[in-house]
Amino acid sequence: MLYNLLLPYIHNSHIANLFHYITFRSGLAVLVTLSLSFLIGPRLIKFLQTLQKYGQPIRLDGPESHQAKAGTPTMGGIMIILSSCFSTLLLADLTNKYIWITLFGFVSFSIIGFLDDYAKVTKNNHYGVKGKSKLLLQGIISLIVCILLEYTIDSPSHMLNVPFFKSLSMDLGYLYIFFAIFVIVGASNAVNLTDGLDGLATVPIALTAGSFALISYLVGNLIYSNYLQLTYLPNTGELTIFCASIVGSCLGFLWFNAQPAEVFMGDTGSLSLGGVLGIISVITKHEIVLGIVGGLFVIETISVIMQVYYFKATKGKRIFKMAPLHHHFEKSGWTESKVVIRFWIISLIFVLIGLSSLKLR
């Protein structure tokens, strides 16, 4: 909004001219979301405590240390969503179609998460909305996003680029839409599965969003994209501001979510954040890179899939003491803080590997 309001004065005012730069607006987005999180966080937590009689339901079969978390409110993802959306609307170019499509997906996935959290806190169990119903809703929203990208964006591409190779890409044709839906829904649920310990998912989400802030900026810049031999995608640079908003809001949320957490992100936050990262990876044509920089989310998801299939195949045996993987290490004697920090380090390693693909070709 500020960009659009100041646009006529960019060439006449040094201050207005600053808003012409995506880098300046992105840095400002981080500061705005951080400030908003600190401002609304305590009030939101108090409101959620009043609203939720029992707080986030705690699994009885989980690590014993988790029983101390009983009564902690959930739906804290509202803080992330409000601050990110406000910052994006304030600082991004509101004539940019990518911004509106991304915001649509972000808010839509947050509504699914909210309904899931609401069902959990009202019924006082951890089941929430049925899995098939949730997947169906996620699939519908992802399909709408793909249709919007297909018919509102100039020259939509169905190419799948393979990282670390200069010219290796595949034209999936209209099958790309199904692949994109898989990426978006998969990312949404992968982040949701990772969000099981205080602060565990928050930092990897921020790192992944930061990675795609850089990717969005590079592919949206003709000079940098040509230099790095990336597919040039005009107008995607504005997504840098949205990604920066997520980074700032996640860091602000971590202030309240660090162990011992005052509030949980809930599905309201995890489903929406994972979904929107999937959407941005599709827009920037870096879907496989999302699987690399978000490698921690992939590992957590694979651990659940392996556990479920092995349990069914062996009629009751388990590969891990508990899935997702972070619970396995808790059951093995690691403290929660050790699991969280070590997983953050692993996430950082994946991010560095993923970003190296931008240059190593």
Curated annotation (Swiss-Prot):
GO MF annotation, one: metal ion binding
An individual GO BP term: cell division
EC number annotated for this UniProt entry: 2.7.8.13
PROSITE patterns (UniProt xref): MRAY_1, MRAY_2
Names of the cofactor(s): Mg(2+)
Broadest EC class assigned to this enzyme: transferase
Protein name: Phospho-N-acetylmuramoyl-pentapeptide-transferase
Organism this protein belongs to: Rickettsia bellii (strain OSU 85-389)
